[in-house]
Regions:
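Phosphate-binding/catalytic loop of phosphoryl-transfer enzymes
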Residues: 69-71, 77-192, 196, 200, ...
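ATP-binding/phosphotransfer module of carbohydrate and carboxylate kinases, centering on a glycine-rich
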Residues: 1-68, 80-82, 106-110, 139-142, ...
Length: 371
């Protein structure tokens, strides 16, 4: 997958949070300006839009040459290709359809692309992060195997997702692709999976296991420290909170990879606790179904490997390569019979991956228009 490490074009981008907006500019997959931060004023549309225009104006003035595009992640629901933002829970001033993209195109006279953060995270990791990292290791190991497809998830306030397939971002016909958070919770069949894979899920399970009110539960970073013995608290409850997150996430991700058949990369604030949940996540992905006749079979035909585990990484890279004879000929060819998928952590960091994804998405769109 071609990257843009040496591209001289500049793209302005935005990290849109519920309380603040952070603006910057990218060139060659790197930030070239200081970050400009403004309040979101999400309950006042005029102020909110004014802050967005003002932030991009300030960044434009900091750029060494005129930007060629604006590209950023913004919450949904939205018609992202049209640049129209729908009714947002965290920015209540957005109601009835706000044509943010067309407004910015008119103001700055450059193309504007908007996507959700989970999709741009996956795209950034596919362009310059986890996907080329793993393929580089496979090449160095002399393996025949290469991956083209990547499923990215972010674990934090929610459970976000994105799919990069063969160098392209899968966005869907309604801007609703990769909505992993809407799949079913493994243990609560009337509940979506995000209630088991999020900050609130970690706190809720800790409260249940420790027998205390949720209001008295610390944040997940402290729960992580309790689990590894760095901070006093109910260690059993802390370990179970992260283990269960891994099991629930692994169930959802196994369903996704049954369709995608590629690598999976994990980002977001909760990914820092990977040592506590990744083993359970991988175990769930490698679990089996039971047929009506009592026989078991793998839920994924291809084994899933924890690529943060050196021993599993070694097996993953080695594969099972042997020489086979072409029927009717004396010629032999190499064959790697180990079908496999791998799961690992972001190599860029979540925010950086989103920014690189936004940069690459804008430039690919510009390049496509030239053809």
């Amino acid at each position: 997958m071609a990257g843009y490490d040496h591209d001289s074009r500049i793209v302005m981008t935005l990290d849109a949070g519920g309380t603040s907006f952070r603006f910057s500019a990218m060139r060659g997959n790197k930030r070239i300006t200081d970050t400009v931060t403004t309040p979101s004023n999400g309950d006042n549309l005029k102020k909110c839009l004014g802050n967005i225009v003002g932030g991009f104006t300030e960044i434009k003035n900091k750029c060494p040459r005129p930007p060629v595009a604006i590209s950023f992640a913004f919450p949904g629901p939205a018609d992202y290709p049209a640049g129209i933002i729908g009714d947002l829970p965290n920015l209540p001033a957005f109601r009835g359809g706000i044509a943010l993209g067309p407004m910015l195109e008119h103001t700055f006279r450059v193309p504007v692309t908007i996507n959700n953060d989970g999709e741009l995270f996956a795209y950034g990791e596919a362009i310059a992060g986890f996907l080329p990292y793993v393929n580089g290791l496979l090449e160095k190991a002399g393996s025949l195997k290469r991956f083209k497809n990547l499923f990215g998830v972010t674990l934090g306030t929610g459970f976000g997702g994105g799919i990069a397939r063969g160098g392209e971002l899968l966005t869907g016909d309604n801007s609703n692709a990769s909505q992993i958070w809407l799949t079913r919770h493994k243990f609560l069949d009337k509940t979506n999976v995000e209630e088991g894979v999020s900050i609130r899920a970690i706190r809720r399970v800790y409260a249940e296991e420790a027998g205390i009110p949720v209001a008295d539960v610390p944040d997940p970073r402290v729960i992580e420290q309790i689990a590894i013995g760095e901070v006093s608290g109910n260690r059993t409850a802390a370990v179970e909170a992260y283990r269960r997150l891994g099991e629930v996430a692994g169930n959802a991700m196994a369903n996704a990879l049954a369709l995608i058949d590629g690598l999976a990369v994990i980002g977001g604030g909760l990914s820092k606790g990977w040592r506590l949940f990744l083993p359970a996540l991988i175990a769930e992905m490698n679990d089996s179904y039971v047929a009506p006749n009592g026989e078991s079979f793998r839920r994924l035909p291809q084994p899933a490997f924890n690529l943060e585990d050196p021993a599993q990484m070694k097996t993953f890279l080695k594969g099972k390569t042997r020489a086979i004879t072409v029927p009717g000929l004396k010629r032999k060819i190499k064959y790697d019979s180990l079908q496999r998928v791998g799961v690992g952590l972001s190599r860029l960091g979540t925010s950086e991956a989103i920014a690189i994804g936004a940069y690459a998405f804008a430039l690919r769109k510009l390049d496509a228009l030239k053809r």
